[in-house]
């Protein structure tokens, strides 16, 4: 999953400039043409390079509305586009719609290709099954959480790429918003919290992961997002853990976590002490 994040968030993608940052004010969806889906299913692949070439050849700006992993119903608008030249003929517009529609590959199931949320959902499903009463395998769940840790770390340090894509001449051609950090964090933490909070070992392990991520994060908003997830996890653990000792352990970890997040020097000392943050060697 981490390698997929690296491929979806390349460092070379350009950033928005003054002209593109306020595109919503100049290019209104009400004035755009729409490309509707001919049938329903999951978006499995989006041919980004072809979209840019189509936009360049017809002098368009294309706004993608569905990304890989989204479920699309017949008639939904897959993309909008604006003509930068004079209005084309009806036949030309029909050809443009067909070309753009062909860039969206659809199927009955989601796939891993271009879809980082699919991988996150798969791990959450494995974790949930591992912690179900009939299985009760917290070690498999902890293994899933370790991969969550790696992926969240990669997301937290990555620069979210601009949604604006340019052709070789430097003209903006395609607008396609990536999966945000907040969305990715929510998919992992919000979907798994109920299961994680019900077991002492997994609850404490996830607390340590969120503490380490928050304490080591240099992005203020993302740091607070990690802390917020820690708060939610502790609140859930308070209501779901049954044993008095387990509740005391959760409380002790949470109180120490708040101190570590607030004081970077304490974070370093805790790592060096080889207790519950960082490695154990």
Describe the residue ranges of each PLM region:
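Inter-helical turn/loop segments and adjacent helix faces that build the functional surface
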Residues: 85
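Short basic (Lys/Arg) and small-residue
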Residues: 1-60, 67, 76-80, 88, ...
């Amino acid at each position: 999953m981490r390698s997929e994040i690296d491929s979806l968030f390349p460092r070379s993608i350009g950033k928005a400039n003054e002209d593109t940052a306020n595109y919503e004010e100049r290019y209104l969806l009400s004035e755009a043409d729409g490309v509707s889906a001919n049938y329903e299913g999951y978006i499995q692949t989006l041919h980004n390079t072809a979209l840019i070439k189509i936009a360049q050849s017809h002098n368009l700006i294309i706004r993608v509305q569905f990304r890989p992993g989204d479920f699309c119903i017949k008639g939904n608008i897959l993309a909008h586009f604006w003509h930068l030249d004079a209005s084309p003929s009806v036949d030309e517009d029909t050809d443009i719609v067909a070309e753009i529609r062909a860039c969206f590959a659809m199927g009955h199931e989601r796939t891993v290709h271009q879809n980082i949320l699919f991988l996150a959902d798969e791990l959450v499903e494995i974790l949930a099954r591992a912690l179900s009463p009939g299985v009760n395998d917290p070690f498999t769940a902890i293994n899933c959480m370790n991969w969550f840790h790696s992926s969240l770390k990669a997301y937290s340090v990555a620069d979210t790429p601009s949604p604006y894509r340019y052709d070789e001449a430097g003209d903006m051609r395609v607008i396609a918003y990536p999966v945000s950090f907040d969305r990715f964090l929510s998919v992992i933490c919000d979907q798994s919290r109920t299961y994680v909070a019900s077991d002492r070992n997994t609850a404490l392990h996830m607390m340590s992961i969120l503490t380490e991520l928050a304490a080591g994060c240099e992005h203020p908003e993302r740091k607070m997002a990690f802390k917020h997830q820690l708060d939610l996890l502790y609140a859930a653990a308070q209501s779901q853990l049954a044993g008095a000792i387990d509740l005391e352990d959760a409380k002790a970890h949470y109180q120490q976590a708040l101190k570590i997040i607030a004081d970077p020097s304490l974070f370093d000392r805790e790592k060096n002490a080889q207790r519950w943050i960082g490695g154990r060697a």
